Amino acid sequence: MQVILLDKIGNLGGLGDTVNVKSGYARNFLIPQGKAVMATKGNVEMFEARRAELEAKVAEQLAAAEARAEKVNALEAVVLASKAGDEGKLFGSIGTRDIAEAITAAGVEVAKSEVRLPEGALRNTGEFEISVQLHSEVFATINLQVVAAE
């Protein structure tokens, strides 16, 4: 199925690209989220008419994400207290939701879907570098200190 992308999508293309994707991906993800429209003749003409407006919107989103990234990078360290055993092993784990709430409490709004934990949830106390993906092109890192709660 051919679609016109209305946003930059990793491993697929950028704004205005006409790409072939599987029909389920287009119908269930790209089109409902407003990231693409079907590549019909009418939609191609509509896209060309709105191209400048869409490019301005994408540039605005990128600038907002870069501003948020500067705020996240400006944070010294985020401290998260959790119950832990004697050897520093946590009772339970710290996931993306907990980290996002801690960063938000520190003063920068971050959604849990933006927090990247490639090794999975944190299960030990210590210092960790956490990556936050604020936009498809904008990443920020933050130092997270996990300490044992009293």
Swiss-Prot record:
GO process terms (BP): translation
Pfam families assigned: Ribosomal_L9_C, Ribosomal_L9_N
GO cellular component terms, semicolon-separated: ribonucleoprotein complex; ribosome
Keyword rRNA-binding among UniProt keywords: yes
Protein name: Large ribosomal subunit protein bL9
Top-level taxonomy: Bacteria, Pseudomonadati, Pseudomonadota, Gammaproteobacteria, Vibrionales
GO molecular function annotations of the record: rRNA binding; structural constituent of ribosome
Annotated keywords: Ribonucleoprotein, Ribosomal protein, RNA-binding, rRNA-binding
Function: Binds to the 23S rRNA.
NCBIfam families: L9
Entry keyword annotation includes Chloroplast: no
